[in-house]
Protein backbone atom coordinates (compact mmCIF):
# COMPACT_ATOMS: atom_id res chain seq x y z
CA UNK A 1 0.00 0.00 0.00
CA UNK A 2 2.74 2.43 0.98
CA UNK A 3 4.70 1.73 -2.23
CA UNK A 4 1.63 2.59 -4.31
CA UNK A 5 1.22 5.94 -2.56
CA UNK A 6 4.89 6.83 -3.11
CA UNK A 7 4.66 5.77 -6.73
CA UNK A 8 1.65 8.03 -7.26
CA UNK A 9 3.29 10.92 -5.41
CA UNK A 10 6.40 10.79 -7.58
CA UNK A 11 4.71 10.17 -10.92
CA UNK A 12 3.68 13.79 -11.53
CA UNK A 13 7.02 15.46 -10.64
CA UNK A 14 8.98 12.86 -12.60
CA UNK A 15 6.63 13.24 -15.56
CA UNK A 16 6.94 17.04 -15.50
CA UNK A 17 10.73 16.83 -15.34
CA UNK A 18 10.77 14.46 -18.31
CA UNK A 19 8.47 16.78 -20.24
CA UNK A 20 10.62 19.80 -19.40
CA UNK A 21 13.76 18.04 -20.59
CA UNK A 22 12.10 16.85 -23.79
CA UNK A 23 10.65 20.25 -24.66
CA UNK A 24 13.65 22.40 -23.77
CA UNK A 25 16.18 20.10 -25.37
CA UNK A 26 14.49 20.08 -28.77
CA UNK A 27 15.44 23.34 -30.43
CA UNK A 28 13.64 24.57 -33.49
CA UNK A 29 15.54 23.85 -36.66
CA UNK A 30 12.89 24.11 -39.35
CA UNK A 31 14.36 27.46 -40.39
CA UNK A 32 17.57 25.74 -41.54
CA UNK A 33 15.84 24.39 -44.64
CA UNK A 34 15.73 28.01 -45.90
CA UNK A 35 19.52 28.42 -45.76
CA UNK A 36 19.52 30.30 -49.07
CA UNK A 37 16.93 32.89 -47.94
CA UNK A 38 17.48 34.88 -44.73
CA UNK A 39 14.02 36.43 -44.88
CA UNK A 40 12.31 33.04 -44.94
CA UNK A 41 14.61 31.88 -42.16
CA UNK A 42 13.51 34.79 -39.98
CA UNK A 43 9.83 34.15 -40.77
CA UNK A 44 10.28 30.50 -39.86
CA UNK A 45 12.05 31.37 -36.60
CA UNK A 46 9.26 33.76 -35.59
CA UNK A 47 6.62 31.11 -36.34
CA UNK A 48 8.50 28.20 -34.72
CA UNK A 49 9.11 30.13 -31.52
CA UNK A 50 5.43 31.04 -31.36
CA UNK A 51 5.99 34.81 -31.49
CA UNK A 52 2.70 35.14 -33.37
CA UNK A 53 0.83 33.61 -30.42
CA UNK A 54 0.90 37.08 -28.87
CA UNK A 55 2.19 39.38 -31.61
CA UNK A 56 -0.66 38.84 -34.07
CA UNK A 57 -4.08 40.42 -34.18
CA UNK A 58 -5.34 37.06 -35.52
CA UNK A 59 -3.93 34.94 -32.68
CA UNK A 60 -6.54 32.76 -31.00
CA UNK A 61 -6.70 32.79 -27.22
CA UNK A 62 -4.89 29.83 -25.67
CA UNK A 63 -7.00 27.26 -23.83
CA UNK A 64 -6.33 29.01 -20.51
CA UNK A 65 -7.20 32.46 -21.90
CA UNK A 66 -10.77 32.33 -20.60
CA UNK A 67 -10.05 30.90 -17.14
CA UNK A 68 -11.22 33.12 -14.27
CA UNK A 69 -7.94 34.29 -12.72
CA UNK A 70 -5.40 33.98 -15.52
CA UNK A 71 -7.68 34.82 -18.47
CA UNK A 72 -7.79 38.61 -18.01
CA UNK A 73 -4.00 38.71 -17.57
CA UNK A 74 -3.44 36.67 -20.75
CA UNK A 75 -5.86 38.82 -22.74
CA UNK A 76 -4.22 42.04 -21.51
CA UNK A 77 -0.74 40.69 -22.32
CA UNK A 78 -1.81 39.73 -25.85
CA UNK A 79 -3.39 43.14 -26.40
CA UNK A 80 -0.22 44.87 -25.20
CA UNK A 81 1.95 42.63 -27.40
CA UNK A 82 -0.05 43.50 -30.54
CA UNK A 83 0.05 47.18 -29.57
CA UNK A 84 3.86 47.00 -29.50
CA UNK A 85 4.20 45.09 -32.79
CA UNK A 86 1.90 42.95 -34.91
CA UNK A 87 4.22 40.55 -36.72
CA UNK A 88 1.55 39.10 -39.04
CA UNK A 89 2.24 41.36 -42.03
CA UNK A 90 5.99 41.15 -41.52
CA UNK A 91 6.05 37.35 -41.47
CA UNK A 92 3.81 37.18 -44.54
CA UNK A 93 6.06 39.67 -46.35
CA UNK A 94 9.17 37.68 -45.47
CA UNK A 95 7.60 34.44 -46.63
CA UNK A 96 6.68 36.06 -49.96
CA UNK A 97 10.01 37.83 -50.52
CA UNK A 98 8.55 41.29 -49.98
CA UNK A 99 10.19 44.16 -48.06
CA UNK A 100 9.41 44.83 -44.40
CA UNK A 101 9.09 48.17 -42.67
CA UNK A 102 12.17 49.68 -41.07
CA UNK A 103 10.27 49.98 -37.78
CA UNK A 104 9.41 46.26 -37.66
CA UNK A 105 12.97 45.43 -38.67
CA UNK A 106 14.35 47.53 -35.80
CA UNK A 107 11.95 46.02 -33.25
CA UNK A 108 12.77 42.43 -34.19
CA UNK A 109 16.50 43.18 -34.32
CA UNK A 110 16.42 44.88 -30.91
CA UNK A 111 14.55 41.95 -29.42
CA UNK A 112 17.14 39.49 -30.76
CA UNK A 113 20.00 41.65 -29.47
CA UNK A 114 18.51 42.23 -26.02
CA UNK A 115 16.94 38.81 -25.48
CA UNK A 116 13.90 40.57 -24.05
CA UNK A 117 11.34 38.21 -25.55
CA UNK A 118 9.50 36.22 -24.53
CA UNK A 119 8.82 37.65 -21.08
CA UNK A 120 9.74 35.35 -18.20
CA UNK A 121 6.14 34.90 -17.11
CA UNK A 122 5.43 33.47 -20.58
CA UNK A 123 8.52 31.36 -21.21
CA UNK A 124 8.57 29.77 -17.75
CA UNK A 125 5.10 28.27 -18.12
CA UNK A 126 5.34 24.56 -19.03
CA UNK A 127 3.22 24.93 -22.16
CA UNK A 128 5.64 27.55 -23.50
CA UNK A 129 9.00 26.03 -22.66
CA UNK A 130 11.35 26.19 -25.59
CA UNK A 131 9.98 29.44 -27.06
CA UNK A 132 13.07 31.55 -26.38
CA UNK A 133 15.45 32.24 -29.24
CA UNK A 134 18.65 30.23 -29.14
CA UNK A 135 22.01 31.75 -30.08
CA UNK A 136 21.86 30.48 -33.67
CA UNK A 137 18.38 31.94 -34.20
CA UNK A 138 19.49 35.28 -32.75
CA UNK A 139 22.49 35.29 -35.09
CA UNK A 140 20.26 34.65 -38.12
CA UNK A 141 17.91 37.49 -37.17
CA UNK A 142 20.75 39.94 -36.47
CA UNK A 143 22.52 39.06 -39.73
CA UNK A 144 19.27 39.42 -41.69
CA UNK A 145 18.53 42.82 -40.10
CA UNK A 146 22.05 44.06 -40.82
CA UNK A 147 21.84 42.96 -44.47
CA UNK A 148 18.35 44.41 -45.04
CA UNK A 149 19.34 47.70 -43.43
CA UNK A 150 22.49 47.88 -45.59
CA UNK A 151 20.56 47.05 -48.80
CA UNK A 152 17.41 49.10 -48.25
CA UNK A 153 17.85 51.76 -45.59
CA UNK A 154 21.28 53.32 -46.04
CA UNK A 155 22.08 56.27 -48.23
CA UNK A 156 25.29 57.53 -49.75
CA UNK A 157 26.94 60.13 -47.56
CA UNK A 158 27.83 63.45 -49.09
Regions found by a protein language model. Name each.
Residues 13-20:
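Bacterial N-terminal signal peptides
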Residues 44, 52, 72, 76, ...:
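Solvent-exposed, polar/charged alpha-helical surfaces in well-ordered, non-transmembrane soluble domains
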Residues 72-127:
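Extracytoplasmic electron-transfer domains, predominantly the class I c-type cytochrome c fold
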Amino acid sequence: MRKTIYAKMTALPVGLCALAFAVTSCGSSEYKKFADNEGKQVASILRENDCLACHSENAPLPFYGNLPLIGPVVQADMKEAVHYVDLTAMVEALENGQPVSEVDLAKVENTALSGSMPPAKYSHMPMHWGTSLDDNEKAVIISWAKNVRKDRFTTETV
